[in-house]
Structure formats: structure tokens, C-alpha cells
């Protein structure tokens, strides 16, 4: 006999909306978080084939914020932006960092949570998700010996690329005018927080002109100029900006014009975010 998947009105006249909410509460966030993690890793690994640059898979770490429903629980848990005037944003917000493939725009991993938590702390949580034989492009705000050396020294061929800050200071070790090694001092504050950090660390500096005609200096762990040509490294940096379309799609197309997560509690907000991230990769 065929399996009847439709319940008749006599048996079940309808499913109350409260039953759906209760089911979500029972499910929690963990099953969706695990499903996203398993699928994201498998899909990214499969789609990276044939799309590497000189044997390196390419990624970018980028941050964004999402609004949540304005409930007391969400506001207490996630917090909200506070303006210079002292006013607080109308909606609670969560902060999110994603590890995105530059080749496919698929999400490899994501971390998110309280709005007031510093992006650097979220970035540390993403380091383990970055695979070996890879190049990860960062925003200049992540220029930190603790983060970048952690990435570089754990695993095989885990490289980074990041623009220098305007106030970055270093000792130039080579005479080449636009492609040279530099030695930078690790701040006393960083070494106090992490005594394992060295007093100095080295990087390769490459001077480029951006697509907007601005002069920039890129810092990278790709030290061998013959194995990693400067012009090709600059191209990897330019590709990083293409993932901005990922966030636009996630916010405007998947969340709708309201751009606001609908769930009313922190647990269901997290569940909803994992569901949205999973759906984006589909």
C-alpha cells in the first residue's frame, strides 16, 4: 500500500502556528549548525578543484551585521549599536564573520554572536576552519601578529594577504623599491596577552596601485618572489572585493526588504542564521 503523507481533516484539522514555534524551540540551533558545517566544508572542498591559484585555495574573511527582531531577550543577548550621541539603535544587532571562497563565493565557515564582541575575537575562532594550502585575504583591521602568525604557523602552507595600515611601521630588509621584506615589532600589549609571540615578525611588502588609482602596500606571508609573483598577488587582493555581492545577496534577496531576522529569542535567532547560511550555499 502507498504511504499516505497527508493527514485528513478529521484526524488533524490543522497545525497551529504555535506548534511550529514549539518545534523550533525543541530543535535548537545545534542540528542546523552541524548541518551547515558539514555541508559547507564538503561543498567547498569539491568546488575548489581546478580553481586554485598556484596550488592555493583562496579565501577572504569578512564581517557584517544583521538586525534581529526587537525583543527584550534579543536586545539583552546580542546588544545594539550605540551612536556617538549616546542614542541606541532601534533594533538589536548581531555581528558575523564569514570565511568565503574567492573562487566560488561559497561560505566555508561562519561565526556570529553579540554585537559588542570585537571582530578580532571572532577572527580567532575562524582560524581553525581555514584549510591547508590556502591564501586568505583580510581587511586591514585584522593586521595582528597574533592572528596572522597563528594562521601561518599552524598547518601547511596557510598564507595570508592584508593591506598595511597608514600608520604601520617596519624596518625594510631589501633594496627593491616596490617588492621587499619587512620586519615589524610585535606590540608589548600583544606579547603580554600571548607570551608565545616573538619580539619581531617578518612579511613581504608589495606596493601596488589599486583599481581606484590609490597607492597601497600589501603585506603577505608569501615571501618567495619567484614562486609568488607580485602582480598575481595584487590580483588576488582585487578579487577579495567581489565577495561583497555575497552579503548583498544574503541580506537583500534572502532576508527580504526588511533585512531583519524574524526570530524572537537568541536561540531561534541563531537557528535562523544557520538556516539562512545553509540556504545561501545551496
What is the role of each PLM region?
Residues 1, 24-27, 34-37, 54-55, ...:
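Single, function-defining residue in the core of a domain
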Residues 10-27:
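Major-groove recognition helix of helix-turn-helix-like DNA-binding domains
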Residues 10-12, 50, 88:
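Short secondary-structure boundary/capping segments within folded domains
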Residues 16, 60-61:
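Noncatalytic, basic helical substrate-engagement surface that gates or grips nucleic-acid strands
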Residues 41-48:
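A short, well-structured juxtamembrane/interface segment
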